[in-house]
């Protein structure tokens, strides 16, 4: 038992699991219908990245070659040094993105379903309703004492709530995924291995490392209708996707391996960003201006300079 003082001093940052420290990952992907569409949209997506011709060290040929099949359109494939690729579709902060993708330069980009890169930590998924692990039973009263008989297992759906992006890419992808399960025109149903995927829901600790992983083998069965209104006070459009699963497994992530991976991937990534000359870590010229190690004078002068620029622009805009 903790006393109140011990709780405040020692366990304030590691007390209980917070409901917003989670992330969702496509561990495996369905492999139908997307291959026929990838070739037609990969060049278009590359031209609309909004960056120069060399994006994160990838050329147009590399992007076309690195496209894989995911839900009718695919995502851009992230290959870590370990060779494991995952598809991040939602995370709370950059710490969770860093713990999953293992690179500061790439991990800050949320990979969308249609090869479009977003320079953010990713907030497309804002809620996950985990299903219950529940057995069906009935009570037999034919004996002196009631006897409980297990009749089977009840599988509740997995419900993931999305924020619709500015071009509704995730909404269209989920709609087509449901149509891939059963064609709305012909009524033909796809094979399970062609439309099933594994969604992994990770629980993260306060330092960003995942400690629990829940894996679902499932496919989407419904996409809710977003509510559109002129009286909505400019709210963000949201929709829910319901997944039916066959298998749900929960397991712990080995902490020692997570720490070893963090040391090899994250810390080395930080050193590569900050620069390491002759074994001594030092800031580069561009990053040294952002450091607080040089005192507060430089930061205050930079803030004052920026404030003056903003004030000048505000006066001009006000005059117009």
From Swiss-Prot:
Record's keyword terms, sorted: Late protein, Viral baseplate protein, Viral release from host cell, Viral tail assembly, Viral tail protein, Virion
Domain of life (superkingdom): Viruses
GO cellular component: virus tail, baseplate
Compartmental location: Virion
Triggers of expression: Expressed in the late phase of the viral replicative cycle.
UniProt record, GO biological process: viral tail assembly
Function recorded in the entry: Baseplate protein that forms, together with gp48, the baseplate-tail tube junction. The tail tube first 2 annuli are formed by gp48 and gp54, which are in continuation of the spike complex. Involved in the tail assembly. Morphogenesis of the baseplate is completed by association of gp48 and gp54, which bind the upper part of the baseplate dome to form the platform for polymerization of the tail tube.
Assembly, per entry: Homohexamer. The tube second annulus is composed of a gp54 hexameric ring. Interacts with the tail tube protein gp19. Interacts with the first layer of sheath proteins gp18. Part of the baseplate macromolecular complex which consists of gp5, gp5.4, gp27 (central spike complex); gp6, gp25, gp53 (inner baseplate); gp7, gp8 (intermediate baseplate); gp9, gp10, gp11, gp12 (peripheral); gp48 and gp54 (proximal region of the tail tube).
The protein's name in its UniProt record: Baseplate tail-tube junction protein gp54
């Amino acid at each position: 038992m903790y006393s109140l003082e011990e709780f405040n001093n020692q366990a304030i940052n590691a007390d209980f699991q917070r409901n917003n420290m989670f992330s969702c990952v496509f561990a495996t992907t369905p492999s139908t219908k997307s291959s026929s569409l990838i070739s037609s949209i990969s060049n278009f997506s590359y031209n609309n990245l909004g960056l120069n011709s060399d994006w994160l060290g990838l050329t147009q040929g590399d992007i076309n070659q690195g496209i894989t099949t995911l839900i009718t359109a695919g995502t851009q494939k992230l290959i870590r040094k370990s060779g494991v690729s995952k598809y991040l579709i939602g995370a709370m902060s950059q710490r969770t993105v860093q713990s999953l993708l293992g690179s500061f330069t790439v991990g800050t980009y949320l990979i969308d379903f249609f090869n479009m890169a977003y320079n953010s930590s990713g907030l497309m998924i804002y809620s996950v309703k985990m299903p219950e692990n529940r057995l069906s039973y009935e009570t037999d009263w034919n004996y002196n004492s009631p006897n409980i008989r297990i009749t089977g297992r009840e599988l509740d759906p997995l419900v993931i709530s999305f924020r619709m992006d500015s071009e509704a890419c995730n909404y269209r992808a989920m709609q087509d995924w449901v149509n891939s399960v059963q064609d709305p025109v012909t009524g033909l149903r796809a094979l399970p291995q062609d439309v099933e995927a594994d969604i992994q829901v990770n629980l993260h600790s306060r330092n960003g490392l995942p400690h629990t992983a829940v894996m679902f083998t499932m496919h989407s069965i419904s996409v809710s209708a977003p509510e559109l209104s002129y009286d909505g006070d400019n709210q963000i459009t949201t929709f829910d996707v319901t997944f039916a699963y066959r298998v749900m497994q929960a397991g712990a992530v080995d902490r020692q391996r997570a720490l070893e991976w963090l040391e090899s991937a994250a810390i080395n990534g930080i050193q590569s960003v900050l620069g390491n000359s002759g074994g001594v870590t030092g800031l580069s010229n561009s990053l040294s201006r952002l450091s607080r190690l040089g005192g507060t004078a430089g930061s205050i002068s930079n803030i004052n300079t920026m404030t003056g620029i903003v004030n000048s622009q505000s006066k001009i805009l006000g005059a117009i």
